[in-house]
Amino acid sequence: MAVARSSRSAAATPRSGAEIRAAFLSFYEERGHKVMASASLIPEDPTVLLTIAGMLPFKPVFLGQQKRPAPRATSSQKCIRTNDIENVGRTARHHTFFEMLGNFSFGDYFKQQAIEWAWELSTDLFGIDPKHLVVSVFREDDEAEQIWRDVVGVNPKRIIRMDEADNFWASGPTGPCGPCSEIYYDFNPELGDEGIDLEDDDRFIEFYNLVFMQYNRDAEGTLTPLANRNIDTGLGLERMAQILQKVPNNYETDLIFPLIQAAADLAGVDYHQLDDAGQTSLKVIGDHSRAVTQLICDGVSASNLGRGYILRRLLRRVVRHGRLLGIHQPFLVTMGQASIALLKDAYPSVIERQEVILAELQREESRFLETLERGEKLLADVLESKPKQISGAQAFELYDTYGFPLELTQEIAEEHGLDVDLAGFEQAMEQQRQRAKAAAVSIDLTLQDAIDQVAADLNATSFEGYDLLVQSSSTVQALLVNGEAAASASDGDVVQVVLDNTPFYGEGGGQVGDRGLLVGDGPDGNGLIVVIEGVSRNRGVFVHSGRVQLGRLGVGDVVHGQVDRACRRRAQANHTATHLLQAALKQVVDEGIGQAGSLVNFERLRFDFHCPRAVKPEELEQIETLINGWISDAQSLEVNEMAIDQAKAAGAVAMFGEKYADVVRVVDVPGVSMELCGGTHVGNTAEIGLFKIVSESGVAAGIRRIEAVAGASVLAYLNEREVVVKQLGDRFKAQPGEIVERVVALQEELKNSQKALTAARSELAVAKSAALAVQAVAVGKHQLLVARLDGVNGDGLQGAALGLLDQLGDATAVVLGGLPDPSDQGKVILVAAFGKAVIATGQQAGKFIGAIAKLCGGGGGGRPNLAQAGGRDGAALDAALNTARAELKKTLG
């Protein structure tokens, strides 16, 4: 019996991306599904860099590791995939960022209901004529075929059996798995039902995948039925938009095309008039702009590792394809703004994170433009020799010396019909690793080897220092004297001591090891004192480093550990303050901030965190106030051990990439901070005393650092500042309260002097340029003036060029170049100003001056009528101007 379709007017059929998304979720909500918000692109699953599928947030539920949120759920999940990045823009349907609409059953309904609803959604809600639909089933899934044929009523000729590679889903080599069934849209049903080939991408597009999780696969590959069978489906929003909006590809839907149009406007081109290469570049920019906006919004910062590298790669591809279209000025911020405008209704978080998104785009583009100019120049030199292949050594030089990504070298090579010797590249990379390894300076390798050997032969040390600072007794398990294993040590010996249990904290989690004493009777009863200067860990074994101050120490001796209380108090105050700092940063700056590293010692603390911009002074002030408020609240800390899943469910903050045991230690400042942490802490926030931020700075791309002091160290810091203030007061002959006023007055004087100097330079440029007009020469129907003008800055040179253009008329091309500071050959400025009649010949000032600037080791660009570029080789300026003159004579003549 076929499933009935209710009539639905064409006007009511969803068309826009937003309508399709809302209609899908409403359809399943009406059928008892709980609507779930999209999860972050940064998954909780540590085995996956990014959220790559709609089911990924539910994977722990499917695997039985987590309680189901409801028997039925539906979502629109944002996803990122980069495994087919080279196909983005070249095919009709490959993307990096996409939205996956899905409906899920956790042990509730199963195959027949999922199939019936999928068909009803496609044909009734979305109004697709069944003659345009084809379904696939797993070759052994007779049940699914029977449902499609006998229950839904699909023509048997339009039910295609597929192999395991296409229609069988598995979470891994073992575990839950099952067959799947897919619905395809047929763009050309008039071609008939005979010999249907679903691999024909021009005719068919798969838009809905239904996974029937009904088996468990064991290590031998045996399939056994699951007690609770599940449904996992995915419908591609972009693909459905293409179908319903009747456009040639996903890129021309309202989900992406506004970004393509924004990029086309920046490039001054018409998408529909471009060749395939030009359209591909616009599609890449449109696709990647959505992806990078969402990645940054969810807390990813560009870097050379993991998901940060994926973001950096996408950003650099956008810039690269922009340049192929003639966009030489920075434009990522503009594309970011367009992306935010397009995404904000579905994802309001992009508005909340707008400042962070745009700052990261601007910072990363600025860095890459410098890299790109250097790398493209070298690569152009390589290509000029017309090689058959880019050698591995050349690709590695681009990567190692110029920071030019290998993927970009491959792309540019492909554009010229070449490939890259990847084996040679890897060989050069390995040689570099070996050179770095050989050059590395390692302190006392023999000692480290000895410690490794000792640690390998012993059981882990029992740490008792959370509760004890003075120990009743412990036994010496092993001893190193001056770097070598020994049975005993005496006065003056430098030692490494391993005990069976210890109150000393071993360095870890950013916190330094404790200091203190080991005391005992000694073998001769005359006493023993070992001064411990640091404690490290090696495979769970605590190694106490120090010097024997009195007596003799031997393996098997009983000693008593005494931790330096003052040092421990300072370290644990700084450690708890670090937790408060992270909590305050999340509250004041951005909830998505994550720890990148930390150092907690006896004097101060240092906290590194992912953030694309500097923390503002007013934010630092807020953070200080917030932390000191929490200190004043005198809150008692709660420390508990619990299962890792329980800790995460409770909201405990974990450091990404860190490996944790099944049972973890959770340090909780109630209502303020909860973190997984093995370090030592104060019992009450009041013990910290006071907190003061010393500095905020950048340490790497997307990584900021705050250094701070707490407790008694704050007083020492303030005393140092007081000395500095006194010295400044003496220097300016001012009281402390007058120093700022004096400095502001001096700055104003300097500013006025700089303005006067700039004005004088501009006047000089105008005066000099008036005299240059006589150097103009007639070239056909045009006037051409190419001249050198040193001692003038960029604004002055532009003003001079425009003045000459006004003086000589609309049929004039003016090119000026010079050294702003004649004594500095490392900075060149070039300006081009073209009249309308010159532009009408096809010349554009921006493209022209950018090409000339490359001759001076630089680059730049601008508008068709006025553009400025820079260079780094003053010695090449005259030759560059001669080239400009010759090129324009040839073009305008």
From Swiss-Prot:
PROSITE patterns listed in its UniProt record: AA_TRNA_LIGASE_II_ALA
What organism is the protein native to?
Answer: Synechococcus sp. (strain CC9311)
Name-wise, this protein is: Alanine--tRNA ligase
For whether the record's keyword set contains Repressor, the answer is no
Q: Which UniProt keywords apply?
A: Aminoacyl-tRNA synthetase, ATP-binding, Cytoplasm, Ligase, Metal-binding, Nucleotide-binding, Protein biosynthesis, RNA-binding, tRNA-binding, Zinc
Q: What is known of its domains?
A: Consists of three domains; the N-terminal catalytic domain, the editing domain and the C-terminal C-Ala domain. The editing domain removes incorrectly charged amino acids, while the C-Ala domain, along with tRNA(Ala), serves as a bridge to cooperatively bring together the editing and aminoacylation centers thus stimulating deacylation of misacylated tRNAs.
How many cofactors are bound and how? Binds 1 zinc ion per subunit.
Q: What does this protein do?
A: Catalyzes the attachment of alanine to tRNA(Ala) in a two-step reaction: alanine is first activated by ATP to form Ala-AMP and then transferred to the acceptor end of tRNA(Ala). Also edits incorrectly charged Ser-tRNA(Ala) and Gly-tRNA(Ala) via its editing domain.
Positions contributing to Zn(2+) binding: 575, 579, 677, 681
Q: What's the cofactor?
A: Zn(2+)
Record-linked InterPro entries = aa-tRNA-synth_II/BPL/LPL, Ala-tRNA-lgiase_IIc, Ala-tRNA-ligase_IIc_anticod-bd, Ala-tRNA-synth_IIc_core, Ala-tRNA-synth_IIc_N, Ala-tRNA_ligase, Ala_tRNA_ligase_euk/bac, DHHA1_dom
Give the gene symbol: alaS
